[in-house]
Amino acid sequence: MWRTIKKLGNYYMEIKYNYTTIFPVPIHQFDISGFDQIKNKLIDYAYDMQKRDSVGKTASNRGGWQSKSFIIGNEDDVLHSTLMNCLSGFPTIKKSFGLNGEAWININKTGNYNAKHHHPNSNLSGVLWIKIPENSGRIEFISPVDFQTDREIRSYTEEFRDENRIHHSYYFPPIEGRMLVFPSHLIHHVTQNKSDEDRLSVSFNITLNT
């Protein structure tokens, strides 16, 4: 809280200032301890899937390979088990809600990226980073708040903007073994892979059921 004393004629007034941030957008984060023990298995899983279906599908991917979607939990393997272990332990979702989802593999080679998009017909979406070389692309979310002009954002101090994350967009650095889960309506994209290696990840959509 901020306050100041101002003089008004022969009187003094105390002015108090405070603010409240409303309508926050939660971004959930899971970090897998000991990810190095399963990383190579997940990499092999991704490339094996690509060998079985080299065409894949085209969605937001620009030049990259994307697998066709598969139901999470339908197979008893390292990928399905990893996703289920993370999502079944969601501490901020009521136990009365069930989670059903589908996932797909992403392989972005040098120069590939994912264009701006959102995920309709689902409640939550997410990504698990498997193999992330340096400078291979990061995820950027576009603010759902409709600022009429850039002037409002620029008028705030940098400290205030950073403290309350008031920006047009927000980047998350990709880290191997980390999973992000976010509201499906959030527009986002993945920047270009500027490394000399493949970038591997698993994306997914979740529907919440009561």
Label each residue range with its predicted role.
Residues M13-S96, N106, Y113:
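Non-heme Fe(II)/2-oxoglutarate
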Residues V202-T210:
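Short peripheral tails and domain-boundary helices/loops at the edges of structured domains
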Residues K95, N114-H119, T191-K194:
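Short histidine-centered beta-strand/loop micro-motifs
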Residues I105-V181, D198, L208:
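Catalytic core of non-heme Fe(II) oxygenases with the double-stranded beta-helix
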Residues N112-Y113, H185-H189:
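Histidine-centered metal-chelating micro-motifs
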Residues I187, T191-S201:
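Ligand-binding loop in jelly-roll beta-barrel domains
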